């Protein structure tokens, strides 16, 4: 079911580190005049360890509280959390729909070697992300299935 592009819209940008989430989210933010939520940016601005899962969870909860308020006002919100699990994506989709928002999923993927190269080139992570850590993340990441993708109003799969 295609919903109006003029009403509230939630855009979920999904993928592993180095997949291009921030690049896409910033492009969409500018083009759509959307509000973008990135926990990494907030944690960096607060000089917090981006690997502190407890604080990340609190920041994401706060971002989602603001996001829902903005959706209720009819705005476009971009969630740039990675959303590694289907249950997290389902929760966001269902809550946004309850507010009358259309929901988009943009899944970005790339081979591990490409992800690792991008992560090393940007050099933002402290401590560094090592290849074995990235391989563990690849194992736990739940790739959106065709059945899940069909639940969204609009979707895209972008890869290298």
Q: Model-derived features: where do they sit?
A:
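NTP-dependent small-molecule kinase module
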Residues: 1-6, 31, 139-160
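P-loop (Walker A) phosphate-binding loop of NTP-binding proteins
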Residues: 16
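Conserved substrate/cofactor phosphate-moiety recognition/catalytic segment
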Residues: 19-75, 117
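Glycine-rich phosphate-binding loop used to anchor ATP phosphates in small-molecule kinases
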Residues: 54-104
């Amino acid at each position: 079911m295609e919903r109006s592009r003029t009403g509230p819209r939630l855009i979920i940008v999904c993928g592993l580190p180095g997949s291009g989430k921030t690049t896409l989210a910033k492009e969409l933010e500018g083009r759509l005049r959307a509000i973008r939520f990135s926990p990494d940016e907030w944690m960096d601005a607060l000089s917090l360890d981006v690997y502190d899962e407890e604080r990340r969870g609190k920041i994401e909860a706060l971002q989602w509280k603001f996001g829902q308020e903005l959706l209720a006002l009819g705005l476009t919100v971009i969630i740039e959390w990675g959303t590694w699990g289907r249950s997290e994506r389902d929760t966001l989709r269902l809550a946004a729909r309850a507010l009358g928002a259309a929901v988009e999923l943009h899944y970005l993927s790339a081979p591990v070697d490409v992800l690792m190269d991008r992560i090393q080139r940007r050099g933002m992570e402290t401590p560094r992300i090592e290849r074995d850590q990235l391989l563990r993340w690849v194992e736990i990441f739940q790739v959106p299935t065709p059945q899940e993708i069909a639940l969204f109003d609009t979707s895209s799969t972008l890869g290298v």
